[in-house]
Amino acid sequence: MAVITISRQFGSGGQTLGKKIAEKLNYPFADNEIIQMVAKEANVSSQWVENIEKEAGTNLSRILSKMVSQKWIDRVLADERGYIDEKIYLDYLVLIIAKIADEGDVVILGRGSQYILNDHPDAYHILLIDKKESRVNFMEKHYNLSEKKALQVVNFEDRRRVSLYKKLGKIDYEDPSLYHLVLNMNRIDMDTALKLVCEMVTQK
């Protein structure tokens, strides 16, 4: 049984590699499914969870949380509809990622899974890094963005990830000692990365 977590600098190809690993090993790939599971537990829409996730740790999130009145929350609860904010999202995130890992043989993309499963005996933690220029180029190529827009997205996601990890009490997500394998995607191609991860997992 193996649990593979994929952490990455945004635009380094983590989602692409994660899907390839899952396909190669015939493992499920946990990404958007995590959003759906959080939404189900909190009794809210997946879109609501996506919005919370996108703004986790940002100033906008804190501003919005202050704007939500207790009266509004009481009305939502009275209607037996759920409610979720940044803290509730993080609490559910920890529980759900741990639950997914307990089922075994899975690839989990991001969301602080390398921290949440740090002590999991069957977990392999992978980090992808790359030069910012290459990450911007990756976003242009794979998501059909202009160079300006791709740079904006990469910068925003870099800041958002740091904020999210701070909320989890961690600020050192690029510390190589957290990971079994760090892949510099500026030095190797996707096929080599796939081979390295699969060999590591299957040779245990």
Question: Which residue ranges define each predicted feature?
Answer:
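Extreme N-terminal starter segment of soluble prokaryotic enzymes
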Residues: 1-4
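Glycine-rich phosphate-binding P-loop
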Residues: 6-19
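Short beta-strand-centered segment that lines the nucleotide-binding/catalytic pocket of NTP-utilizing
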Residues: 28-39
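ATP-dependent small-molecule kinase phosphotransfer cores
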Residues: 39-105
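Small-molecule kinase domains that catalyze NTP-dependent phosphoryl transfer to phosphate-bearing small molecules
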Residues: 59-65, 146-190
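Short, amphipathic alpha-helical "lid/cap" segments that border enzyme active or binding sites
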Residues: 94, 190-198
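RNA pseudouridine synthases
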Residues: 100, 112-119, 138
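Conserved phosphate-donor/acceptor-positioning beta-strand/loop module used by diverse small-molecule
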Residues: 119-141, 147-157
